[in-house]
Regions:
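Phosphate-group recognition and catalysis centered on beta-loop-alpha active-site segments
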Residues: 1-250
């Protein structure tokens, strides 16, 4: 069965709402627990750093939208971030949920046999790698970078890691991305996914991760990804996917 990757948020044209949006607030342990409940094999998260160099899980660069704090997380000390309420905005029953530290997420994932996809935002790459290694989770993490130079730097720092993801817009971009970044996993939007795209990725020994994201019904798109034999399907609604296809294997 296809592993499913669940984000800690989902994107729409007008707003950002949490992964499994009817279940739990993003960037919290409650969100992780909901993924565990539904058997999600891989949790994608955005990693950013505090003023005192502690890594947190937060999609936005600021705390305003999902906590009772304001301003950039990079200007906050971890001792203060840890006091913020990251759940009340979503529903009263989640009052008191905290912004999730990467360390706590890694430990929870290790306990439950989950993979974590790290979407790097800022902070020391070496510090990030050391933290993941210290928690014994390097072999259970995927890595993705929005900036090409960060991906290249990461590849040089950790050549042994075989889970570097790279966004590829279309089939014609595969050669360039492979040459420049040497990725292990091709990430592609479902609308750009074709049989030839998958074939070319296989020729380069790339796994394929299909992005099937958004708030609307994705039944047809999910089936397309399954039929084309992708390795991972990223979804904002893991509970619906698993209801149809069953719990994934990691």
């Amino acid at each position: 069965m296809f592993p499913t990757a669940c984000r800690h948020h989902q994107d729409t044209p007008d707003q950002r709402t949490p992964c499994a949006a009817t279940i739990a607030p993003e960037n919290t342990m409650a969100s992780v627990d909901s993924c565990i409940k539904y058997g999600v094999g891989n949790i994608e998260c955005d990693v950013c750093i505090s003023k005192d160099s502690v890594f947190y899980i937060l999609h936005d660069s600021t705390l305003d939208r999902t906590t009772n704090g304001t301003g950039a997380i990079s200007q906050w000390l971890s001792t203060d971030i840890d006091t913020l309420d990251a759940g009340s905005w979503f529903a009263p029953r989640f009052a008191g949920q905290r912004v999730l530290r990467l360390t706590d997420l890694l430990r929870k994932a290790k306990e439950h046999g989950l993979r974590i996809t790290i979407d790097y935002r800022n902070g020391s790459l070496q510090q990030l790698l050391n933290l993941i290694k210290d928690e014994g989770m390097l072999e259970n993490c995927n890595f993705t970078f929005s900036k090409e130079q960060h991906a290249k730097c990461f590849r040089k720092m950790a050549p042994e890691v075989r889970t570097l993801q790279a966004y590829i817009k279309s089939e014609k971009d595969i050669e360039h991305v492979v040459k420049e970044l040497h990725p292990d996993i091709a990430v592609v939007w479902i609308d750009s996914l074709t049989p030839q795209f998958v074939k070319r990725c296989r020729e380069h020994n790339l796994q394929v991760l299909a992005l099937v994201l958004g708030p609307d019904d994705k039944t047809e798109e999910n089936q397309k990804a399954v039929d084309l034999g992708v390795d991972i399907i990223a979804t904002d609604h893991p509970e619906k996917f698993i209801m149809k296809y069953g719990k994934p294997s990691i």
